Regions:
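Conserved glycine-centered beta->alpha loop in an early N-terminal alpha/beta scaffold
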Residues: 102
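Residue-level preference for alpha-helix termini and adjacent loops
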Residues: 43, 67-68, 76, 82, ...
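Conserved SAM-binding loop of SAM-dependent methyltransferases across substrates and taxa
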Residues: 105-118
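Class I SAM-dependent transferase core
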Residues: 3-4, 8-95, 99, 129-146
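S-adenosylmethionine
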Residues: 4, 14-16, 119-252
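Short, well-ordered helical secondary-structure segments
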Residues: 56-59, 70, 75, 108, ...
Length: 252
């Protein structure tokens, strides 16, 4: 499974990063991004805010042009996308490895990599045009903690092991559990970003959770007081699959 792109191991100099991100002649008022709300500086502290603003511009420019983000999403890019994903960093353990399944335009994987340089992030995406976009933005943002990998989660099962898996708007929970738990060490966590039907999805996934050897499942709310509505996560802790001893423990 080929690695499409890896960011250079170089930290940008202090100050804002301002590359040319799109064809300015085709940029219109409809996809000009709003100023970030004040809370964004808390979610993206220090240098992370410079990178976050550039990433938001990338999404609104090249991301819209390539069909990775709808133009109607641009006016709410901070609240609905950047901050909604950024608050997930609150529950990601320190110094971990994380795979973002079906990363798409990089939400939440790129956002988490910006906020948490201590976390090694793999952006897993099957479509070539998306992996090309992800590789370009990781290089522009100089995220040396990011790997872009073209492929599907089910193809990577038991070949790589991670501490955390994330996913946003990829597939129903039962299928996501089947794809993600084989990528996790025993005790690793799936953090699935879900909406108001999250509890219903958990009930519909009970059989798959048991078959996949899930140790526990719970609803977690993050970002209260920072985003409205707060972000809802389904957190699944991986156990040992029934009759399967392949899952690995984290090395200490």
């Amino acid at each position: 499974m080929p690695v499409v792109g890896r960011a250079e191991a170089q930290v940008p100099a202090a100050g804002p990063i301002r590359p040319k991100l799109y064809d300015e002649e085709v940029m219109t008022e409809s996809n000009e991004i709003p100023e970030p709300p004040a809370i964004a500086w808390e979610v993206f502290p220090g240098e992370a805010m410079d990178r976050a603003r550039v990433y938001a511009e990338l999404l609104a420019g090249s991301g819209v042009e390539r069909g990775l983000l709808g133009p109607r999403e641009v006016p709410r890019i901070w609240d609905r996308h950047m901050l909604n994903c950024g608050v997930v960093a609150e529950v990601v353990p320190e110094n971990t490895t994380l795979v973002d399944i079906g990363s798409g335009a990089g939400l939440p994987g790129v956002v988490l990599a910006i906020i948490r340089p201590d976390v090694r992030v793999t952006l897993l995406e099957p479509l070539l045009r998306r992996t090309v976009f992800l590789s370009e933005i990781t290089e522009i943002l100089k995220l040396d903690n990011v790997e872009v990998l073209r492929g599907r989660a089910e193809e990577l099962a038991y070949k790589r092991v991670f501490d955390v898996a994330t996913a946003r708007a990829v597939t129903p929970l039962d299928r996501l559990v089947a794809w993600s738990l084989p990528l996790l060490r025993e005790g690793g966590e799936l953090l699935a970003m879900k909406g108001e039907r999250a509890a219903e999805e958990i009930e519909n996934a009970r059989r798959q959770l048991q078959a996949s050897g899930a140790r526990s499942v719970e609803l977690v709310t993050v970002g209260e007081g920072k985003v409205e509505p707060p972000t809802t996560l389904v957190r699944v802790v991986a156990g040992r699959p029934p009759g399967n001893g392949k899952r690995r423990r984290r090395k200490r």
